[in-house]
Amino acid sequence: MSKDEYLITDPPLKALTVFAMPMILGSFFQQVYNMADSIIVGQFVGSSALAAVGACAALTNVFICVALGAGVGAGVLVSRYFGAKNYGKMKTIVSTSLISFLILSVVLGVFGFCFSHFMMSGLQTPADILEEAVLYLRVYFAGFPFLFMYNILSTMFTSIGESKIPLGLLIFSSILNIFMDLWMVAGLGLGVFGAALATLIAQGISAGFSFLIFLSRMRQYKSSFSRFDRQELYSTLRIAVPSVLQQSTVSIGMMIVQAVVNPFGTQALAGYAATMRVENVFSLIFVSIGNAVSPFVSQNFGAKKIERIKKGYHAALVLDLCFAVLAFVVIETLHTQISSLFLGKDGTALAYQVSGDYMSWLGYFFIFMGIKMATDGVLRGLGIMRPFLIANMVNLAIRLSVALICAPRFGIAFVWLAVPAGWLANFLISYAALRRSWPEDKAAVSQ
């Protein structure tokens, strides 16, 4: 029995915890990339530069989620074939996905670079930070293929039960990013451009090492395979496209909601940007648990160990509850200190008020996001994509309607009131679909 097969052999809570923890730590260090930019820019350049970097965050997260969703979609099939020990099919999916999604990343990178000014203007970015925001975004898109490749390869690693290698690479590149941020921003005085360039270089190094290590791992599975299979690409896209939409739901919501925040001014945007970084840290914990559930479910489904799927779902809910309590305690006790970490001495009373109010509200409702992500992870692992997609679109619609209609009329507080309402509605729809489609009913998996 391969050491990578523990997801189908060990007790579900133990297996999922061992598997998910490196992914959770990886999510933290993924945010270190962006937080390092924000903290260092905020401390050494000022709150306007922080607002410029923060103004890009919602948009860059959408493109990150395209990479994550594409990887998760391919990873479901990789996990299923790995669980069934069909290594030839597994390697065909890997090769086909890497070729297809690398081409996609180049196209998206060119698109983003060319239309950076148009997109930031469309988000109603304040005029005093627009040019710096566009500069940051263009450097980001120049390195987008590196980011895309790293995220795809990271998902491939986790699909075969290996979550420690991408964590190690991410820790290395995060530390490198911090040192380069300090050198380029504080040392060379390159400002927003230096922060973006430091991130690009660190991501490129991480992607290169990931590819070499993953190539070595795949050579251990001695099976013939096709380098590109159109039918397998279609099968991958059937899961990847809804996964991209699901992964993007949160970020698309943030991007459009940011357009609601921007007219409130640069200081309100700085406070919102500071809290959004914190929200991203905790959100990605729950996203990671949901993403860990998918290969657990898919591997056990491929191995025909159906009884373990429900136990794995319950184990994920336990992990979600633990981290929701942790998020609440951290935010309630340290929200002022966390805000000052980003805003520094230049932050106004308005910036601190927006940041503190938003952060405190989120602390009460992260559990909704956790159970939503775990439920979505089971549906995705089983390939039940229709209700999965509907639930996430309802989530987005609720968040946007509350923010767009109420915030301009009644105040900025309605921006964060909309967030848990969408999470709760998403969970209710996903859970109802899951109750009807547990894998004892094999026909449900073909939805």
Residue spans for each PLM region:
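N-terminal transmembrane alpha-helices
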Residues: 7-44, 58-73, 77, 102-109, ...
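Helix-terminus/linker motif at the lipid-water interface of multi-pass membrane proteins
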Residues: 28, 32-50, 120-127, 183-190, ...
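Hydrophobic transmembrane alpha-helices of multi-pass small-molecule transporters
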Residues: 62-65, 177-181, 206-211, 281-284, ...
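Transmembrane helical elements of multi-pass membrane transporters/channels
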Residues: 18-37, 139, 150, 173, ...
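Small-residue-rich hydrophobic transmembrane alpha-helices
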Residues: 50-110, 147-166, 271-335, 369-383, ...
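Short alpha-helical transmembrane segments in multi-pass integral membrane proteins
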Residues: 1-20, 78-143, 187-241, 297-364, ...
